[in-house]
């Protein structure tokens, strides 16, 4: 399949990756396998022994055909991207060792990685989580903080970063919360009584005085609570109660959307609540629009008590 001179080049390339580029053994093995697949495809494509000339003259059609074949064989986007990176790396090595000049392969972009949505939790898993999250914290105000924060995320669909940025100013409106999310997109989310009640209870026993513009969720030392700290609490929860491995703060945001959809909320309203579509400013948001959003939300939301 391969001309002996090609195998010698591959061996030198592997040594280069290990000794000069300091690549891990795992990476070198993966790259070698990807290059091997590429050269096997080249052999099949040309119906001939693969020589250095075949490698030099490989055109864009051959390379794209190889990528397409990998896609048809159900390789993940990450695997396809890594394969292309491996072959590009080999070609770069050939350039470096004066085996060839600039090649067409460097103009081919890696496929965009598919962004997988986090899996949602069942309503039973959510109920268990909300019921038992208070068991972690060791201090009453921390326990109440954990519950208030988790209920807030599940009841509003906020990103963890958005939830941890909530201040006392956000609590002044009794009907809804106004959030400026990613890309400066504004959205309006109705308050559920259970959320405001829990936050109020938490603030009443919080041992730190806060200004109106300071985030209300604090760590044990009084500083702004960090996402990693809260997710550690969730790890304890899911391990003790045998909850799904994908349970994280963000999975409650996804569950918020999934459960609303299951309970009859329309997709447009859910997109608005999640901040996936731009909304007008609050001033341009008519009272009718707000009332409609509140109506859809409160009638569909699984936890309304």
From Swiss-Prot:
Chain's role: Site-specific tyrosine recombinase, which acts by catalyzing the cutting and rejoining of the recombining DNA molecules. The XerC-XerD complex is essential to convert dimers of the bacterial chromosome into monomers to permit their segregation at cell division. It also contributes to the segregational stability of plasmids.
Pfam family membership, one: Phage_int_SAM_1
Designated name of the protein: Tyrosine recombinase XerC
GO biological process: cell division; chromosome segregation; DNA transposition
Gene Ontology, cellular component aspect: cytoplasm
Family membership noted in the UniProt record: Belongs to the 'phage' integrase family. XerC subfamily.
Keywords: Cell cycle, Cell division, Chromosome partition, Cytoplasm, DNA integration, DNA recombination, DNA-binding
Catalytic residue positions: 159, 182, 250, 253, 276, 285 (o-(3'-phospho-dna)-tyrosine intermediate)
């Amino acid at each position: 399949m391969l001309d002996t001179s090609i195998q010698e080049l591959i061996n030198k390339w592997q040594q280069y990756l290990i000794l000069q580029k300091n690549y891990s053994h795992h990476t070198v093995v993966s790259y070698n396998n990807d290059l091997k697949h590429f050269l096997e495809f080249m052999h099949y494509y040309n119906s001939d022994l693969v020589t250095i000339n075949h490698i030099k003259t490989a055109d864009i059609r051959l390379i794209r055909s190889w990528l397409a074949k990998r896609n048809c064989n159900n390789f993940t986007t990450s695997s396809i991207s890594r394969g292309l990176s491996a072959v590009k790396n080999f070609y770069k090595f050939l350039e470096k060792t004066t085996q060839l000049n600039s090649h067409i392969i460097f103009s081919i972009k890696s496929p965009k990685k598919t962004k997988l949505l986090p899996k949602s939790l069942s309503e039973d898993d959510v109920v268990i989580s909300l019921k038992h999250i208070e068991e972690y914290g060791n201090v009453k105000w921390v326990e109440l903080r954990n519950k208030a924060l988790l209920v807030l995320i599940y009841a509003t669909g906020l990103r963890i970063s958005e939830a941890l940025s909530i201040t006392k100013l956000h609590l002044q409106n009794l009907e809804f919360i106004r959030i400026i999310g990613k890309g400066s997109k504004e959205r309006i989310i109705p308050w559920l009584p259970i959320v405001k009640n829990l936050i109020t209870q938490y603030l009443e026993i919080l041992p730190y005085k806060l200004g109106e513009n300071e985030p209300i969720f604090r760590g044990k030392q009084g500083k702004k609570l960090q996402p990693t700290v809260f997710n550690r609490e969730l790890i304890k929860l899911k391990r003790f109660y045998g909850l799904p491995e994908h349970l994280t703060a963000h999975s409650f945001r996804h569950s918020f959307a999934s459960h609303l959809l299951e309970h009859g909320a329309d997709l447009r309203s859910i997109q608005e609540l999640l901040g996936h579509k731009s909304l007008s400013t609050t001033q341009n948001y008519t009272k009718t629009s707000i009332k409609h959003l509140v109506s859809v939300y409160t009638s569909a939301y699984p936890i309304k008590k």
